[in-house]
């Protein structure tokens, strides 16, 4: 098969040819072959003929109707034609030789027997169609495999690339654009309002200019200041409206776009071809829709409006500065390149670090979803610690990246603050020089005044400070751009089989003619392992075709190709004469009905699960389909009937019930083509017979492909085809194949004799014996029984199904008051970072002291400007400039350490919370996961978002809040010291600010606490994890619509939150402007009335005979001037101290939405952490049994599932198993057999009764120790992403490679594993779809065997295996079972007839028990079940 793949690659891509090796002549290789691979009449050797370079047909040596060939070489090898068509050169021989070289490297080359009726025809196929036609289809075909260097280069490019900021808004609709436009206008005007205060303040400064008393002795300061205060009040009203609009409009626009992007991402994910999911983990994809989109929303919501606001402030400040005094402004802006360089570097590094961090978090989310979704397997094999460690390792990667991001974040903040305050030093020094030298202001055409300098300086202060305030927004934008990169990659990817596309043929009906022509195929995740190479198959309309053969031979791949889950790498598949790639994908799949071996149900009602097969189906149609699938009886007996919730992945239903619902889902589709992949494997005998009858009716007139290991289900097929290693080696009717006595004949013989305990006695195969017909006649010929008796049995079987089915959950309306988690508890969780806390707190103190210090220094500078003495101005201005330099250095250092340390604290908290939350989930009992609120989607959503949001209480945001609190306190201390009267009046307004902020936080917390994203996240998670079922039943649009419906609740709450947040923020800003207004008005009054003024000493020191004639008109004027100067100093010190306090309050309140989210998330997180486990598998408590014998006793058990307390599963169940014996449980589907195993493993506790092992009550045993006693092989094996070796080692965590291989040999999996290119290191990938059902089951058996368990639990452990594998695995299990207590659940009674005890379970009670012979003699239910099976 490898040869064929290489030939195809060479034919299609000559430019990628590998080194070519010539073999000049034909070679005859004689190779020894194992006995198992010999066919009848063969000796110990096989003849393999390799083709010469010039003979394309030498692969096949025809001997009449039978040819002998190597299945690993292509039957059609016409690559010379391919190469001539693709490239006019003479590389034909080289291509063939390259294939032959690969051929020689094969470990074994087996002889296959096949029908040669189309051999010559196949050899003459014109393969250039395969290369030329594919481009004509609307969806692509195969892609070249990338080299390692290309992959590395692509990874480097991904790291360096980032989504342009504006592209974040690519999904905005017209409404969003209008909202953003209006929000931008509001933000621009609102941002420009604050620098306007600088003009007002310049007027205030000039209003207090003392030299005015020389010109006008009657000048009244109070009247001037009162007029200025009125302007501020008007400005405050405008700011209130603008702040409301800015915040509300951007929040609404962000909420709308995020909802849309989530839908687009989900739709884009669902439209991808199935092969894409083989290389992209579904759990990471679904995790991204919860975690990455949160960062995306942060980057496009109100933070954008806030950034525009700050940027507008920056621009307006500098515009005012240039207008009032371009010389001074130009000096200040000369340092702006430093800010630009620092900002660019910081943003670039933050973007890269964010992307790496999100990738690590996505991997962690994938681990969480995989393990939570497979919690029963995790619990069985005590894999909780492995899961936690794997999850933690990914979190550690994200944490390490977070540390680096924290460093660059702190560095950026510190650098910006240093440059800004350093610029102030330069500005004041230069401004004082302009005043002292009496330089003419070219704008006002008069000498520079203190008011001019203050207006320019204050405008630039506000503008420059806004850059620092915008820095957190830039960090969020960087995170959003990094998160959007992966999201947009999925959205922009063109699917090769797009179910949403309207292109292609949309057939009204199909006759069902199917033809595979020279098909070559390999799975995208395993390009080196060809499945088909030149595969040919033709099916006539209305035919029923049975596919049989070894596991892994390619049977299920045929179905996948027909469904267009994958496209062939070469060749074509024709449907009614048209290549299926020309059909519309959705239209094609709507005409095909599929029932898989492992049915996938969704966490909704039974009715909705069946309706997935036909959109808009009526209830009558649903019930009719259920009747045909033998599901109506058990459904109608459930308390909620068709409205019963099946639970996540159908966990509330038994295996047989799930399968019957899945069959009903296919039946209601009324397809033209029916694909049945082991569709009755999970059913008991009665159900199998009845469902098979229903399927027989359904198959009439339809083309049907049936994959079956149970040959009785395909005995009447029109054609039966034996598939071996991707080649159809035998075909014909049942009678024709039996007459030929070939591989199919062997398979029938093996299956007819298959028993568990006589396999050891019959170690050698009985081939073509003379007594064969007599032995298999009951299996092959007695296919019809009385329908009336079977209907009666069905009624009895289904009568009690309701005990193992789901009851609709009672919905509780919880209108609880929003809980709160004490801040101290969150901080306590960061206790290990006490040292970082101390340094971070000191840094916040330093940063918080900067602004009060600035108020003091700035006030001194204003006082200097008011003094008309130029010598005084020059001397003191230099000192004040040096004080600004000191402030700049301190601010740079404190901001760096504050930003860095608090971010590190936040990263550590996020890591610890996520790890502990996941550990808390892993320690819960299995019954806890049955609850709707604990579904996989909801839990992974909480893990992805809540822990990260809690960081808002302790990380950088908390640092900023602490900083601003200290700023406020420092400012108030200065204000009270400078003028308590004015301070008290202003402080009287503060309760309004505090109350507004508190109300905002409480209301936002109320909205945030509502679990709005959970249901939508659950829909997405289930759809992506069950993508094959979604694709097969073309329910992609339904899923998207359901997701959209689930989004309505969170979206409406988000809009409410936007209005409240906008109003609260606007009202807070209004209060601040009122404070400014009151400060100037009342301050002017205090100065004018003399309350604020100079002391007698200050007057006497400044009003001397030397200064009066030089500066003042007279002594009275000098006295008034000194009172004005010192009064102005007190007033401005109070004012700027209050301004700094107000800035602290304003910035703290701006983080109210984040803090509210953090507090709500903390409630969710700590509620999970505090949830006790009824059955904790991680605790060390409990007894341990030193020497385990294996005696088991179930004593008077009564049990009902936690989600269905009214439906009793067990009613006095009692059973005793002696050590070393085998006990088989048989009976109706849903009767409680699997529940027995669940209770034994303590997935649940019985309501009444006890279970004993060797006399020990299992409730008293350590849970982990208890589960280590068992080896479980379930009906539907669950494997994990990772290598095959990792999955087998999951049974014994410290297993060596030798132990792994030994377990694989015992489970008959070693041979197919070593045939894979990477052997035991083969990555299974997401959902391990590249393995057949039998291969998965054998790996699962190896996983159980490697534990060397004391007690073996087998739940239909061989139901998915073919006859050959079943025999070998049964032999392996027989060896393992020796000396062990074994419980076997089986529908096939042949596998348990030699059990020491057989118990018939019905409705949660054992109605009869005994050996096989004893139960047959009793002629009870077991006897009837046995004879029913023998008559099939």
Curated annotation (Swiss-Prot):
Regions annotated as coiled coil: 117-163
Matching CDD domains: ABC_6TM_Pgp_ABCB1_D1_like, ABC_6TM_Pgp_ABCB1_D2_like, ABC_MTABC3_MDL1_MDL2
Keyword Zinc belongs to the record: no
Stretches assigned to the ABC transporter domain: 514-750, 1192-1428
Residues that bind ATP: 549-556, 1227-1234
Gene Ontology BP terms: cAMP transport; sorocarp development; transmembrane transport
Keyword field contains Membrane: yes
TM region positions: 185-205, 232-252, 303-323, 325-345, 410-430, 457-477, 838-858, 882-902, 968-988, 989-1009, 1060-1080, 1134-1154
Superkingdom, natural source: Eukaryota
Annotated Low complexity bias: 52-62, 76-106, 118-135
Topology with respect to the bilayer: Multi-pass membrane protein
A molecular-function term among this protein's GO annotations: ABC-type transporter activity
Name of a matching Pfam family: ABC_membrane
Subcellular location(s) of the protein: Membrane
GO cellular component: membrane
Residues covered by the ABC transmembrane type-1 domain: 180-479, 837-1157
Region listing for Disordered, in residue ranges: 1-21, 48-149, 787-819
SMART domains: AAA
Family as reported in the entry's similarity comment: Belongs to the ABC transporter superfamily. ABCB family. Multidrug resistance exporter (TC 3.A.1.201) subfamily.
PANTHER family named in the record: ATP-DEPENDENT PERMEASE MDL1, MITOCHONDRIAL, ATP-DEPENDENT TRANSLOCASE ABCB1-LIKE
Protein name: ABC transporter B family member 3
Source organism per UniProt: Dictyostelium discoideum (Social amoeba)
Originating gene: abcB3
């Amino acid at each position: 098969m490898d040869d064929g793949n290489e030939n195809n690659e060479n034919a299609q891509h000559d430019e990628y040819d590998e080194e070519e090796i010539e073999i000049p002549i034909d070679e005859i290789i004689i190779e020894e072959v194992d006995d198992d691979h010999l066919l009848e009449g063969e000796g110990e050797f096989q003849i393999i003929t390799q083709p010469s370079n010039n003979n394309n047909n030498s692969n096949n040596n025809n001997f009449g109707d039978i040819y002998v060939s190597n299945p690993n070489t292509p039957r059609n090898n016409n690559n010379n034609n391919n190469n001539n068509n693709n490239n006019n050169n003479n590389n034909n021989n080289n291509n063939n030789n390259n294939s032959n070289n690969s051929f020689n490297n094969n470990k074994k080359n087996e002889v296959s027997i096949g029908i040669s009726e189309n051999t010559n025809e196949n050899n003459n196929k014109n393969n250039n169609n395969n290369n030329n036609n594919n481009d004509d289809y609307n969806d692509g075909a195969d892609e070249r495999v990338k080299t390692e260097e290309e992959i590395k280069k692509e990874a480097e490019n991904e790291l360096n690339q980032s989504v342009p900021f504006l592209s974040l808004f690519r999904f905005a609709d017209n409404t969003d654009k209008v909202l953003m436009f209006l929000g931008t206008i509001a933000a621009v005007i609102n941002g420009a309002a604050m620098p306007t205060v600088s003009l007002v303040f310049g007027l205030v400064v000039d209003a207090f200019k003392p030299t005015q008393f020389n010109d006008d002795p009657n000048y009244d300061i109070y009247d001037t200041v009162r007029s200025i205060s009125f302007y501020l009040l008007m400005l405050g009203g405008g700011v209130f409206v603008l702040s409301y609009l800015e915040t509300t409009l951007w929040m609404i626009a962000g909420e709308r776009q995020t909802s849309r992007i989530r839908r687009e991402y989900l739709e884009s994910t669902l439209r991808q071809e199935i092969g894409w999911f083989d290389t992209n983990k579904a759990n990471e994809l679904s995790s991204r829709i919860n975690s990455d989109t949160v960062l995306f929303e942060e980057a496009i919501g109100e933070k954008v409006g806030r950034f525009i606001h700050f940027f507008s402030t920056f621009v307006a400040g500098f515009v005012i500065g240039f207008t009032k005094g371009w010389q001074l402004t130009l000096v200040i802006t000369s340092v702006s390149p430093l800010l630009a360089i620092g900002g660019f570097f910081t943003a670039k590094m933050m973007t890269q670090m964010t992307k790496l961090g999100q990738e690590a978090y996505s991997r962690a989310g994938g681990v969480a979803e995989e393990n939570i979704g497979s919690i029963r397997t995790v619990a069985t094999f005590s894999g909780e610690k492995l899961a936690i460690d794997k999850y933690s390792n990914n979190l550690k990667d994200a944490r390490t990246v977070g540390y680096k991001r924290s460093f660059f974040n702190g560095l950026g903040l510190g650098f910006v603050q240093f440059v800004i305050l350093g610029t102030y030093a330069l500005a004041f020094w230069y401004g004082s020089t302009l005043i002292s030298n009496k330089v003419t202001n070219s704008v006002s055409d008069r000498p520079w005044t203190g008011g001019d300098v203050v207006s320019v300086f204050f405008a630039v202060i506000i503008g420059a400070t806004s850059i620092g305030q915008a820095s957190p927004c830039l960090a969020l934008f960087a995170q959003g751009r990094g998160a959007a990169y992966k999201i947009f990659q999925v959205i922009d990817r063109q699917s090769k089989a797009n179910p949403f596309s309207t292109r292609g043929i949309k057939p009204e009906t199909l006759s069902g003619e199917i033809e595979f022509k020279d098909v070559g195929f390999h799975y995208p995740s395993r390009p080196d392992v060809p499945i088909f190479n030149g595969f040919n198959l033709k099916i006539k309309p209305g035919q029923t075709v049975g596919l049989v053969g070894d596991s892994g031979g390619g049977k299920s791949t045929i179905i996948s190709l027909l469904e267009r889950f994958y496209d062939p790498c070469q060749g074509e598949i024709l449907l009614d004469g048209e290549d299926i790639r020309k059909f519309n994908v959705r239209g094609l799949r709507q005409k095909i009905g599929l029932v898989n071996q492992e049915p996938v149900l969704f966490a909704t009602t039974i009715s909705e699960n069946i309706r997935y097969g036909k959109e808009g189906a009526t209830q009558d149609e649903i019930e009719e389909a259920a009747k045909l699938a033998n599901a109506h009886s058990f459904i109608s007996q459930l308390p909620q009937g068709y409205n019963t919730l099946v639970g996540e992945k159908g966990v509330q239903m038994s295996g047989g019930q799930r399968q019957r619902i899945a069959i009903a889902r296919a039946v209601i589709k009324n397809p033209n083509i029916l694909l049945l992949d082991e569709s009755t494997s999970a059913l008991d005998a009665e159900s199998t017979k009845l469902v098979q009858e229903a399927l027989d009716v359904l198959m009439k007139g339809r083309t049907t492909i049936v994959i079956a290991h149970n040959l009785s289900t395909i005995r009447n097929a029109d054609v039966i085809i034996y598939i071996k290693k991707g080649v159809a080696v035998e075909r014909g009717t049942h009678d024709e194949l039996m007459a030929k006595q070939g591989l199919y004949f062997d398979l029938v013989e093996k299956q007819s004799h298959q028993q568990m305990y006589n396999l050891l006695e019959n170690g050698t195969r009985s081939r073509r014996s003379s007594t064969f017909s007599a032995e298999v006649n009951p299996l092959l010929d007695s296919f019809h029984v009385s329908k009336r008796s079977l209907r009666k049995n069905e009624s009895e079987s289904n009568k009690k199904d309701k005990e193992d089915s789901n009851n609709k959950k009672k919905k509780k309306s919880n209108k609880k008051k929003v809980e709160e988690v004490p801040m101290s508890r969150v901080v306590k969780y960061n206790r290990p970072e006490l040292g970082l806390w101390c340094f971070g707190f000191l840094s916040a103190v330093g940063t918080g002291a900067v602004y009060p210090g600035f108020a003091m220094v700035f006030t001194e500078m204003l006082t200097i400007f008011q003094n008309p003495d130029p010598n005084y101005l020059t001397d003191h201005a230099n000192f004040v400039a040096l004080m600004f330099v000191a402030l700049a250095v301190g601010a740079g250092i404190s901001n760096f350490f504050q930003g860095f340390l608090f971010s590190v604290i936040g990263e550590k908290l996020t890591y610890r919370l996520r790890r502990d939350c996941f550990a808390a989930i892993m320690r819960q009992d299995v019954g806890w996961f049955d609850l709707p609120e604990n579904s996989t989607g909801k839990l992974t959503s909480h893990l992805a978002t809540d822990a990260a949001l809690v960081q808002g209480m302790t990380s950088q945001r908390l640092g900023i809040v602490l900083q601003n609190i200290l700023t406020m306190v420092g400012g108030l201390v200065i204000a009270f010291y400078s003028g308590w009267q004015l301070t008290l009046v202003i402080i009287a307004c503060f309760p309004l600010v505090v109350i507004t902020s508190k109300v905002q936080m409480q209301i936002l917390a109320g909205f945030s606490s509502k679990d709005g994203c959970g249901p939508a996240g659950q829909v997405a998670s289930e759809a992506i994890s069950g993508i094959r079922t979604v694709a097969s039943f073309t329910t992609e649009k339904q899923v998207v619509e359901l997701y959209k419906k689930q989004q309505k609740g969170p979206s409406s709450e988000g809009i409410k939150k936007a209005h409240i947040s906008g109003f609260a923020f606007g009202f807070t800003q209004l209060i601040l402007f009122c404070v400014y207004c009151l400060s100037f008005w009342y301050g002017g009054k205090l100065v004018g009335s003399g309350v604020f003024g100079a002391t007698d000493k200050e007057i006497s020191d400044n009003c001397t005979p030397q200064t009066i004639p030089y500066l003042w008109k007279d002594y009275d004027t000098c006295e008034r001037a000194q009172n004005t100067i010192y009064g102005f100093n007190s007033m401005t010190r109070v004012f700027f101290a209050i301004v700094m306090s107000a800035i602290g309050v304003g910035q703290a309140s701006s983080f109210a939405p984040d803090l509210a989210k953090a507090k709500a998330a903390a409630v969710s997180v700590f509620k999970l952490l505090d949830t006790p486990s009824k059955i904790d598998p991680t605790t060390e408590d409990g007894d341990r049994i030193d020497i385990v014998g294996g005696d088991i006793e179930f004593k008077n058990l009564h049990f009902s599932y936690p989600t269905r307390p009214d439906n009793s599963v067990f009613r006095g169940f009692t059973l005793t198993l002696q050590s070393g014996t085998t006990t088989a449980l048989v009976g109706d589907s849903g009767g409680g057999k699997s529940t027995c195993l669940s209770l034994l493993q303590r997935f649940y506790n019985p309501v009444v009764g006890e279970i004993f092992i060797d006399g020990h009550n299992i409730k008293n045993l350590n849970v982990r120790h208890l589960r280590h006693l068992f080896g479980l092989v379930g009906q539907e094996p669950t494997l994990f992403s990772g290598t095959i070796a990792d999955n087998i080692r999951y049974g014994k965590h410290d297993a060596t490679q030798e132990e792994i291989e030994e377990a694989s040999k015992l489970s008959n999996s070693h041979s197919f594993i070593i045939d894979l290119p990477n052997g035991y290191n083969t990555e299974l990938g997401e959902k391990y779809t590249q393995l057949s059902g039998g291969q998965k089951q054998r790996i699962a058996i190896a996983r159980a065997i490697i534990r060397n368990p004391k007690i073996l639990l087998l739940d239909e452990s061989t139901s998915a295996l073919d006859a050959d594998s079943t025999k070998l695995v049964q032999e392996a299990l027989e060896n393992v079972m020796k000396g062990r207590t074994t419980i076997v659940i089986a529908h096939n009674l042949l596998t348990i007839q030699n059990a020491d005890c057989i118990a018939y379970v019905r409705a949660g009670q054992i109605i009869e028990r005994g050996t096989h012979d004893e139960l047959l003699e009793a002629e009870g239910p077991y006897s009837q079940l046995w004879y029913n099976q023998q008559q099939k």
